[in-house]
Each structure stands twice: as C-alpha cells, then as structure tokens.
C-alpha cells in the first residue's frame, strides 16, 4: 500500500522535526533502513515522504550516528540512484538536501565523493549552472541563483572539499566541475546575486581545491612548488598567503563555519 507507506514516512518526518531523542529512537527501531528501502520504491509520493523524513533524521551535528547509520544501510548509493532517475524538482531538492546534511560528518565525506560526486556534478551542478548553455545567459542567471538544488549540491561539495588530499584530487579531476563553479561566479558578477549562498559555496569549493595545488598536481611537481605558487598568487600584491584568507590559520578558524547541515 504505497499511500500507507508515504503517510507513515511523512508522519516520521513530522514527529522527529527538532527532536533529537525521537531521531535516535527511530534509528534504534530500524527506521532508517526502512526509509532507505523506500528510495527504490516505484511511486514518486513515497520517494518524497521518505526523503523528507531522512533529511530531518540526519540534520544536526548531534545526529552523526544517524548519518553513519544511513551510510551503513546503503543510503548514499540509494540517494544517488534516485537523483539520477527522478525528474521531480521537489524530490531532487530533498535528495540534495539529505546529501548536504550528511556531508557535515567527517566520516562520510569520502564516501560521498566516491558515490555521489559524478552525479552531483553531471546531473545538478553543470546543467543548473548554465555553463553548457551560455547563449541563454540571462535566463540562466535567474535560474541558477533561485535553484535550491544547486544551492544544496554546492553546499554538499563545499563540505566534502575539506576532506584532504584525495578528496581534492578527485574533485579537481571531475570533468566540468571547476568550469561550472567558475561560471556560476562569473554570471553573478555585477549583480545582487554575488552575495548568494550558492556563490559563496562555489568560491569556498574553489578555495579548498586550490589549497596545496602546486604540491599535489603533476604540473606543480614538474614546475616546482615556488614557481607555480608564484603564478597562482601573482595577483595577491605581495601579501602573505595566510593573510589572503584562502588557507593556513584563517582557514582553521573558519572551519566550523564552512560545515553546516544544509536545509534541515
């Protein structure tokens, strides 16, 4: 009975909103596994309710146990499968919202990169950025900054981009990702959208991917660290890299601000 399953999942979503004790109890009763199983259901309404419940269950740093439980249930691949196949905008917003919430848990950053990076890039970030459709630039500007899906996806990648050298390598090598992120920023220049959360996410992803770029890329190893660093920082007007706010001590201070749980 799909309607019963949908209503039950929707009730769990309502029940656990803002209540960490109930969230933990749902996990102990096996509810996360049951909700993950519903992501492969044939009915769109069931997908919508299951995603809404999962989004609430994994919201907040206090619920990292729920995030890990979702991962252990095969939840990340299930979310990716649903994102790949659904055309329902609300479900796409919910799926990317769940992934953004999951991405604040350090233990899940690499699993998200392994299972979700390619689909987030190819199914969300590139098409929503407008990078491949530059002749429609004005229309795309309106769409990309009002896109909750793009905001969620860039928020997720912003968090996982801080997961270390292997994470940075995979993201740098993800075809089209950096181009699309740069296009989002470029399209916002000179408009009020320059202060949007989506643009902020894109800037922070690129900042993290530029960290130790010379030392970690074959081009940098070939040219020598000092030479490539000079090229990268040529517009810094002689300022120390730390004082530029891209890495070093300032990055450590801002780490907690760069990791949040998305849309709730």
Swiss-Prot record:
- The principal localisation class reads nucleus
Q: Which GO MF terms are attached to this record?
A: beta-catenin binding; structural constituent of postsynaptic density
Q: Which Gene3D superfamilies match?
A: Leucine-rich Repeat Variant
Q: In which tissues is it expressed?
A: Predominantly expressed in brain; accumulates in cortical neurons (at protein level).
Q: Which cysteines are joined by disulfide bonds?
A: none
Q: How is it modified after translation?
A: O-glycosylated.
Record Pfam families: Arm
Which InterPro entries does this one have? Answer: ARM-like, ARM-type_fold, Armadillo, Plakophilin/d_Catenin
Region entry Disordered: which residue ranges? 238-264
What are the GO BP annotations of this UniProt entry? Answer: cell-cell adhesion; dendritic spine morphogenesis; learning; morphogenesis of a branching structure; neuron projection retraction; positive regulation of axon extension; regulation of canonical Wnt signaling pathway; regulation of postsynaptic membrane neurotransmitter receptor levels
Cross-referenced PROSITE patterns, in alphabetical order? ARM_REPEAT
Segments annotated as ARM repeats: 20-59, 64-104, 120-162, 166-211
Localization (cell): Nucleus; Cell junction, Adherens junction; Cell projection, Dendrite; Perikaryon
Keyword list (alphabetical) reads: Cell adhesion, Cell junction, Cell projection, Developmental protein, Glycoprotein, Nucleus, Repeat, Transcription, Transcription regulation
User: Does the record's keyword annotation contain Transcription?
Assistant: yes
Summarize subunit and interaction data from the UniProt record for this chain.
Binds to E-cadherin at a juxtamembrane site within the cytoplasmic domain. Binds to PSEN1. Interacts with ZBTB33. Interacts with ARHGEF28. Interacts (via the extreme C-terminus) with FRMPD2 (via the PDZ 2 domain). Interacts with PDZD2. Interacts with CDK5. Interacts with CTNBB1. Interacts with GSK3A and GSK3B. Interacts with DNM2. Interacts with CCDC85B.
Job description of the protein: Has a critical role in neuronal development, particularly in the formation and/or maintenance of dendritic spines and synapses. Involved in the regulation of canonical Wnt signaling. It probably acts on beta-catenin turnover, facilitating beta-catenin interaction with GSK3B, phosphorylation, ubiquitination and degradation. May be involved in neuronal cell adhesion and tissue morphogenesis and integrity by regulating adhesion molecules. Functions as a transcriptional activator when bound to ZBTB33.
Its name, as the record gives it, is: Catenin delta-2
Taxonomic lineage of this organism? Eukaryota, Metazoa, Chordata, Craniata, Vertebrata
Q: Which gene encodes it?
A: Ctnnd2
């Amino acid at each position: 009975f799909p309607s019963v399953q949908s209503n039950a999942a929707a009730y769990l979503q309502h029940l656990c909103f803002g209540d960490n004790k109930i969230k933990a109890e749902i996990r102990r009763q096996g509810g996360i596994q049951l909700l993950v199983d519903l992501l492969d259901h044939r009915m769109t309404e069931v997908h919508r309710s299951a995603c809404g419940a999962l989004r609430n269950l994994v919201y907040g740093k206090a619920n990292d146990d729920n995030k890990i439980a979702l991962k252990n249930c095969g939840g990340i691949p299930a979310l990716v499968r649903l994102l790949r196949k659904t055309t329902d905008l609300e479900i796409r917003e919910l799926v990317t919202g769940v992934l953004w919430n999951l991405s604040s848990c350090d233990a899940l950053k690499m699993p998200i990169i392994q299972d979700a990076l390619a689909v987030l890039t190819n199914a969300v970030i590139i098409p929503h950025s407008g990078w491949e459709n530059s002749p429609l630039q004005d229309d795309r500007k309106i769409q990309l900054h009002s896109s909750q899906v793009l905001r969620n996806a860039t928020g997720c990648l912003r968090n996982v981009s801080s997961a270390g050298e292997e994470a940075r390598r995979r993201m740098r090598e993800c075809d089209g990702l950096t181009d699309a992120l740069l296009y989002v920023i470029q399209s916002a220049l000179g408009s009020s959208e320059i202060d949007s959360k989506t643009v902020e996410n894109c800037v922070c992803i690129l900042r993290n991917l530029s960290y130790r770029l010379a030392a970690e890329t074959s081009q940098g190893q070939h040219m020598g660290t000092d030479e490539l660093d000079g090229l990268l920082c040529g517009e810094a007007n002689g300022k120390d890299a730390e004082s530029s706010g891209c890495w070093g001590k300032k990055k450590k201070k801002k780490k907690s601000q760069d990791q949040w749980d998305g849309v709730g």
